[in-house]
Amino acid sequence: MKNSLWLYKNPYQIEIRENEAHPPQVAVYLYQAEEEIKNVVLIGGGSVSSLWEKSALLDGDRLLIACGNEVFCILLPTLELLWHTQVDMATCFQIVAYQDDYITHGELEIVRLNKQGEILWQFSGKDIFVSPIERTPAFKITPQGIDLVDFNYE
C-alpha cells in the first residue's frame, strides 16, 4: 500500500490507503494525537482508479470515498458505514459537494447523489469522460452547469 491520502478533521487525522495487492480496495485509518484509534477496509466493485485528492470528501461528520465504481459514506469518528452506492459501470474518479448533494465523475457516468446515497439523476456520454490532454479538464462544475470532455473532445 503505497498510495495514501491524508485528511484532517479536528481532533482527528484520517489516512486513506490504496491496497494495490487487492484493488479496488482502500483502508481508512483514524488517528488521534498520532495514535491509530480505528480502521476499516472498503472493497469496491468495477475497475481500479488511483487514489487522489478528489477521491475523498469530508462533509461534516461524514467521509465519502470513491473506491472502484462505488461511493462509500462513513460516519466519523465511529467509521460506521452509512451507505454505499454504485455510481459507474467501470470506476469513479471523484466526488464533489454540489448544493445539498454530491456529484460524482466516473469513467462512463456523471451521477448526482443525495445525502442518503440515492441516485437523483445520471448522465452517460458517447465515450469515456477523460481528457487525452492533461491541461484540459474532463470534468468541471461551473455556475451554468457541468462542463464535460470525453476522449473524443465531444
Locate each region found by the language model.
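Sequence/structural signature of beta-propeller modules
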Residues: 1-47, 150-154
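Short beta-strand elements that form the blades of beta-propeller/WD-repeat-like
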Residues: 11-27, 56-67, 72, 98-106, ...
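Generic "edge-of-domain/loop-turn" microfeature
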Residues: 35, 78, 90-92, 102, ...
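Repeated scaffold domains used in trafficking and secretory/extracellular systems
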Residues: 1-18, 46-60, 86-99, 125-142
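Short acidic/polar capping segments at secondary-structure boundaries
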Residues: 108-110, 117, 126-129, 145
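A glycine-rich, hydrophobic loop/mini-helix early in the fold
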Residues: 37-83
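Short loop/turn segments that connect beta-strands within beta-propeller blades
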Residues: 76-78, 114-118
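Aromatic (tryptophan-biased) beta-strands that constitute blades/sheets of beta-rich domains
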Residues: 29, 35-48, 81-86, 91, ...
